[in-house]
């Protein structure tokens, strides 16, 4: 379903005219969500990294990333998608796509990939917590550093355990 009357090229051209940095895309897209989703229902923030194939040597943040479709590491780019899910309406709207730095760039920043994902959520936590405190993610994120990191931000994780999970009873 389209939410505008113009083609994609029109939006891209007009939003790239020095104004891309001045738009708070999470707030903008949350305003769209308020219009098209039931904000009183059961909502969750979905996060999912997505691999994008890209060749070239000068593209910023190009590196090797996990491709779920290929079940292997691939050369290209990765974005982390943040979306708002309306559980009862079975619909979802994208809030923000955040580009993942390459492994080399993360090493320069003294960060791991998981720490980067936590930093992305922390960056938008103020706006996200106004809507919901539930984060939904795949099994990659069901590791202690990530769970503890988003818990510090005030979120709760809904995920499945990894195949390597070892459960102990206290």
Regions found by a protein language model. Name each.
Residues 2-13:
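Short, basic interhelical loop/turn and adjoining N-cap
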Residues 3-4, 37, 128:
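A broad structural signal for alpha-helix termini and local helix breaks/kinks
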Residues 4, 21-22, 26, 106-113:
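Intrinsic-disorder-associated interaction segments
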Residues 7-9, 48, 138:
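Residue-level detector of functionally special positions within alpha-helical transmembrane segments
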Residues 14-95, 101:
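Active-site-proximal, Lys/Arg-enriched surface segment
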